[in-house]
Amino acid sequence: MKNSIPILPKSVALELTYKCNHHCLFCSCPWYAPNSSYPLGKELSTTQWKWVIEKLYDYGVKTFSLSGGEALLRDDLHEIIGHIRMIGNQRKMNYPIILISNGRLMNEGHLKYFKEMNVHLSMSLPGYLSFEEHTGVDNADYVLECFSKAKEIGLECTANITVTRKNYYELFETISLA
C-alpha cells in the first residue's frame, strides 16, 4: 500500500449510477427521496471510475461494494468489475467484490461473469407476496429464478430484504424461498 491512510475504511460502497428500473418504497438513494433537493450531477465515466478505484486501493481499501441506482444499467459494469479484480490481483488482494442489484436485468451471462470474477451477489427480495407493492414491478419469480441459477453455478448470493410493515409477516417465507 503506497499511501495507506489509517482513518479510511477498508471497505467502500460505490454508487455507480443514479438510474434505476424499480421504484422502491424504501429507496435510500437521496436523489429520489421525497422533497429532495439533492442534485443529480453528471455520472462518472468508465475512466473516472477506474481512477477512483486505483486511488482507493492506493489508500488501503480492500473490499468494494457496487450499487446504484441499479448498477446493471451501466453498460461498463463488467469492465469496472474487471478493473477492480485486475488491480486487486496485481496487489495480491483477492477480496470479494459485492454487487447489490434488484435482479431485474440479471441473466446467465452476468451470473457466469460474476462467478468468474469472485463477485458476491446481493439481490433485493423485499417479500414474495409484497414484491410489487414494494418495488413497483412484478418481478419476484424472476429474482427467485436468478437465485436458483446462481446456486447452481456456485455463485455466492445473499437475499437483501428490507423489512417493513408491509412485509414483516412474510419474512421467514421469503427467506426460505431465496
What does each model-identified segment do?
Residues 4-46:
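Canonical Radical SAM [4Fe-4S] cluster-binding loop centered on the CxxxCxxC motif
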Residues 46-67, 74-178:
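Radical SAM/AdoMet-radical enzyme domain recognition
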